[in-house]
């Protein structure tokens, strides 16, 4: 292998996104006063909250899939997910204000996996390293720049700024152009999403590694060059 550039996803690859999402969602509802004592009682409030959270996760997941397909833009995604739960659960909140508060809380959520910092330090010692993410710009910059991995990242590439989302090959071509890499065999994309990271890397003609930390079954027909189930396994590949 003759890699010079490692492109790597952020959420569920380097950072634990479910933990980030859970903390941000709960803190948003706390700040909005949802858990203030009422005649419903704490147990009932918690039960309702869990139902709202579960529904939000389903709505949000589908919207991000739609984003990858180009069926929705990110500005709309940020608000419509809250519009849906506000309507379905008859909540008395403004979806735009709720979205802004939630994004602020997301930006405070820094939960790297145990091996993340060591991995980034190792990669930085051998290669140029770029994070490539479809995440929301203000959220991702806040999380990365306030984390211990910031000093090991040469470039943060966010779809908001490039104008296209993974799996569009142009975001990977943008990264290669930034690092002045012409030979595609010198580049590898590492990430947890088969549909965004692996398919995107393949669209761009570069090697790929699927980070399958949750032991998911791959029934997509999208086959990565490598698969790891622990971040530590990347040391053996790279």
Regions found by a protein language model. Name each.
Residues 2-114:
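N-terminal helical cap/lid subdomain that shapes the substrate entry/recognition surface
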Residues 115-126:
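Catalytic-core regions built around general acid/base machinery
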């Amino acid at each position: 292998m003759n890699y010079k550039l490692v492109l790597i996803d952020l959420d569920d690859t380097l950072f634990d996104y479910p933990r980030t999402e859970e903390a941000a969602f709960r803190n948003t509802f706390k700040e909005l006063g949802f858990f203030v004592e009422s005649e419903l009682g704490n147990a009932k409030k918690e039960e309702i909250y869990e139902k709202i959270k579960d529904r939000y996760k389903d709505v949000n997941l589908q919207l991000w899939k739609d984003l990858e397909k180009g069926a929705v833009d990110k500005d709309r995604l940020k608000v419509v997910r809250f519009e849906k739960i506000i309507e379905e659960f008859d909540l008395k909140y403004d979806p735009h204000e709720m979205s802004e508060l939630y994004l602020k809380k997301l930006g405070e959520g820094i939960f790297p996996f145990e091996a993340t910092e060591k991995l980034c330090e190792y990669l930085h010692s051998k290669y140029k390293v770029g994070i490539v993410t479809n995440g929301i710009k203000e959220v991702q910059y806040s999380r990365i720049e306030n984390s211990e991995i910031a000093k090991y990242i040469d470039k943060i590439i966010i779809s908001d700024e490039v104008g296209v989302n993974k799996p569009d090959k142009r975001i990977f071509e943008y990264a290669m152009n930034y690092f002045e890499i012409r030979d595609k065999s010198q580049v590898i994309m590492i990430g947890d999403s088969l549909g965004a990271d692996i398919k995107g890397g393949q669209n761009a003609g570069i090697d790929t590694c699927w980070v399958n930390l949750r032991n998911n079954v791959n029934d997509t027909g999208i086959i990565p060059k490598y698969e790891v189930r622990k971040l530590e396994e990347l040391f053996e590949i790279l």
